[in-house]
Amino acid sequence: MNRLIILVVAAVFLGMASAEEDVLKRGFPCRCDSDGPSVHGNPLSGTIWVTSCATGWHKCNSENELFHECCKQG
């Protein structure tokens, strides 16, 4: 029984750790200036951040939005 509890706790801990790594991969994609013109099929390399870009990210388009920014990591 104790082994089962330890196994469950370890599984939950590992699940939380992997979810934390995926946080930066989530969000809605947006078009950076480096993506080229707005044509169907172009990749969207930016991620929308509310209010301003996070540490380690930079604004990647020239549009001025009031409540969000299109940011790229790096």
From Swiss-Prot:
Keyword set includes Disulfide bond: yes
Maturation propeptide residues: 20-24
Organism name: Antheopsis maculata
Family to which this protein belongs: Belongs to the sea anemone sodium channel inhibitory toxin family. Type I subfamily.
Function: Inhibits voltage-gated sodium channels (Nav).
First and last residue of the signal peptide: 1-19
Nucleotide-binding among keywords: no
Domain of life: Eukaryota
GO cellular component, one term: nematocyst
Hydroxyproline found at: 29
Positions bearing Glutamine amide: 73
InterPro entries reported for this sequence: Myo_ane_neurotoxin_sf
Disulfide bonding pattern of the chain: 30-70, 32-60, 53-71
GO molecular function: sodium channel regulator activity; toxin activity
Alphabetically ordered keywords of this record: Amidation, Cleavage on pair of basic residues, Disulfide bond, Hydroxylation, Ion channel impairing toxin, Nematocyst, Neurotoxin, Secreted, Signal, Toxin, Voltage-gated sodium channel impairing toxin
Protein name: Delta-actitoxin-Amc3a
Location of this chain's protein in the cell: Secreted; Nematocyst
